[in-house]
Amino acid sequence: MNRCFRPTLLSAALCAALPLHANEPADAPERSPTELAAVRVQAHQPAATATQTSSFGAGDWKSTPASVNVLDRDLLDSRQVRTLSELASNDASLGDSYAPVGYYQNIAIRGFPLDTGTGYRFNGLAISGEQRLALENIQSVEILKGEAGLAAGVMAPGGIINYVGKRPAEVRNVTLGTDSEGSRYTAVDLGHWLSPRFGVRFNAAWEDSDSYIDHADGRRNFYSLATDWLIGERGKLEVDANYQTSAQRSASGYQLLGATELPRGVDRKHLLGYQAWQRPVGIDSTNLTALHTYDFSTRWQSRVSASYSRSVIDDNVAFAYGCYYAAGCADGSVPGNYFAPNGDYDIYDYRSPDDTRRNLEFRGELRGAFDTGAVSHALSMGADRFERTVDKRRNVNEYVGTANIHDPQVPQFAPSPLMPGASARRLDSAQTAVFALDRMSFGDWQWLAGGRFVRLDERAYDKRGTPERHSRLSRFLPQTALVWKATDEVNAYVSYVRGISLGQEAPFWTSNEGTFLPAVLSRQVEVGVKFVPGDALTLGAALFRTSQPFQYAKPDGSDAGYTFVEEGQQTHTGLELTAQGQLSERLSLTASASFLRARARDAGTPDYEGHQLINVPKTRATVHAEYQLPFVTGLGVTGGWRYAASNVATADGRVSAPAYSVFDAGLRFKHQVGEHPVTWNLSVDNLFNRFYWRDTGSSSGDYYLFPGAPRQARLSVTFAL
């Protein structure tokens, strides 16, 4: 019934080492994570030479034995991406996983929802995912798909999202934007090297958004500063800081009618449960990172980094949930945690102010390259410390009335007179780890071997601050990979990685409410091929299998009717295809497809086996192309297609959201006014105004349905001053 995510218990350490690429010359300078080159989809720029973040270290895209995708600044600008859900629509391996409008959003990679405590990173360091992640200060977004045990330690097995910040440069840009709803957007990007050894980059954005959902308009202010300081001939210090404040009413998700039927005749502009007294959800976030590097020689480098991330959420919502108080559910024949068969739903006055999440991290690392006979080594080793805390006040979560999904106007009810209680520590987690990885090169082969030893100490507390759980675990997480350079254009690889994540919490409607299940070990095997047919195009294919113990609410004879258990295995087997770069001098393409089979077996509940798991479509595809018109210099036509197969919405697989295709289109025009470049972007998402369910994800054990946005046009213009 709680509309919020439960306090995230997965608390992992920083990204692991990114070792030197052994195939590079011995005197090649090492690049820092914040200097990773994005895969640019434009002519004359080799797409395959970009180093990228991955669990197996830094190297060119072709030599990385993992599925990694980079969404660069050019693509983010062309698609006018502003939210995490919009970001996910650009990669077929990603999908929404409880992503309401007006609230912080979460996504899934390869069918596994990310942990909001450890799955999102800025410049390689974990940040609190319980924030509205801004993109104005981001140069590229790196998507590591699959297990990242060495890179992140204790975490969900789907992967990680790494936001790479902009570095100081000579730039002065102003962007103005609006959309078909009347939103107003302004952003500035200013950079300058104040001296040959010290540079700054300042980004800011102010947004007043008019949402397509009634009564859900919002605002956002964002500020960031990045500095680079070259210390002597061998040292460098990079510091990044950003702050954002936002306020917007959160839109509740729909639920199945009577637990068996999708809602029909849904108006996407309707705000479920709207009450005039409902305040917006306020989210204030601060993120700080610092990295110091020192080159002992051309082959050895030390790296010391630290980060701090804080998110404060004032959670206020008239929350639409279940039908416990509705007449259609009074006899108990319909589960109370779903909407009633006729569309009735209960409204709760939910308030949880000062919900505070903090991440603090420190890491020391040594990277080096050396030879032993005919074998070249690129070694990385180090240690890190990660701490995470969650402080929350006792919330108000009171029933105030019942409405129906087809009400033209939601009935108004009086709010609860209760007030939130005092703040108390809910989670205190610490993770200490040591790691090492060696990339050994011999002829056309590379063997990567390493691991991470992690020790976790975590305490959870109830609403009053009374201890209720103390978890301790120590695990070694090995990983290895073999890369074969078949030709100058083709590399093939096979990899094996082990990971660990903490157990889930039993939902309130199960017989063991609030119980945390044991930590789960996961295993992943992946085989891939990467093909670089030219200097500006990359093609990739990856076949993977990831498995972990299955944790779920099992039907039984208890008074609650369900008990949350760990039984059987959950296995995700899939094929991913990617293409990125220039098909011709005028045509660029970013495309991906995912074919995923996610099943449970030996779970002890036959109805829950033999079919796709919830919120994991079997097939996803996304295509975005841009064609430069030959008869108008600087004018490009953009087009996109997004597809998802039917999406299971119940544990027994009997109800699914239908498959959908969505088409996007746009224009991009670059010209100059005097000596100043100007770029216009016009994009139309969901061109044919298709209705579809974009998300059947869960929060606190309950499942929700979120409709996709209707047709929306966006216009922006960027002036280089």
Feature-to-residue mapping (PLM):
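Structural signature of Gram-negative outer-membrane beta-barrels, strongest in the C-terminal barrel
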Residues: 357, 374-388, 425-548, 572, ...
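Membrane-embedded beta-barrel scaffold of Gram-negative outer-membrane proteins
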Residues: 293-295, 301-307, 311-319, 492-496, ...
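Acidic/polar loop-and-plug regions of large Gram-negative outer-membrane beta-barrel proteins
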Residues: 207-211, 224-295, 310-357, 401-423, ...
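Gram-negative outer-membrane beta-barrel transporters
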Residues: 25, 444, 545-547, 565-651, ...
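Outer-membrane beta-barrel translocator/receptor signature
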Residues: 136-139, 150-225, 231-236, 286, ...
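Acidic, small-polar-rich N-terminal luminal/periplasmic segments of exported/outer-membrane proteins
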Residues: 31-170, 527
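Surface-exposed extracellular loop regions of Gram-negative outer-membrane beta-barrel proteins
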Residues: 247-258, 389, 457, 483-526, ...
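Conserved C-terminal beta-signal and adjacent last beta-strands/turns
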Residues: 355, 379, 494, 614-721
